């Protein structure tokens, strides 16, 4: 049974402005593994990746119902499976989780569905 659904839409240019003012912003948002992937990309791809992870983590926080206020960005990790699809590899939710991240132009959108294991 679905117990939560969260959606987030983010402008990549807004993330870029924050990142330009504070390059440590990526360290606040990304886990150690995510940061290693982020650092392997050229600049434009870094922005897209960072915005996607931001949006995915915001969508997760909305799906679980707490918002980021009760979670930290470090509580949630989004990596890719062998096909390149995003997966939630770390979160406080014990059921099944499904995530989709889509990029189009200056926007990134993420959707997270949480499902009870019963």
UniProtKB/Swiss-Prot annotation:
Its cofactor is Mg(2+). It is an enzyme of class 2 (transferase). It is found in: Cytoplasm. HAMAP family: AcpS. GO terms for molecular function: holo-[acyl-carrier-protein] synthase activity; magnesium ion binding. The gene is acpS. This is Holo-[acyl-carrier-protein] synthase. Its main location: cytoplasm. One of its GO terms (biological process) is fatty acid biosynthetic process. Gene3D superfamilies: 4'-phosphopantetheinyl transferase domain. GO terms for cellular component: cytoplasm. Mg(2+) binds at residues 8, 58. Transfers the 4'-phosphopantetheine moiety from coenzyme A to a Ser of acyl-carrier-protein. Belongs to the P-Pant transferase superfamily. AcpS family.
């Amino acid at each position: 049974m679905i117990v939560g659904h969260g959606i987030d839409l983010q402008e990549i240019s807004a993330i870029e402005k924050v990142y330009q003012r504070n390059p440590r912003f990526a360290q606040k948002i990304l886990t150690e593994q995510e940061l290693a992937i982020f650092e392997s990309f050229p600049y434009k791809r870094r922005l897209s990746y960072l915005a996607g992870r931001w949006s995915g983590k915001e969508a997760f926080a909305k799906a679980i119902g707490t918002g980021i206020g009760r979670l930290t960005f470090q509580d949630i990790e989004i990596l890719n499976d062998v096909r390149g699809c995003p997966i939630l590899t770390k979160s406080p939710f014990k059921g099944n989780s499904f995530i989709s991240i889509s990029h189009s132009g200056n926007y990134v959108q993420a959707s997270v569905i949480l499902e009870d294991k019963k």
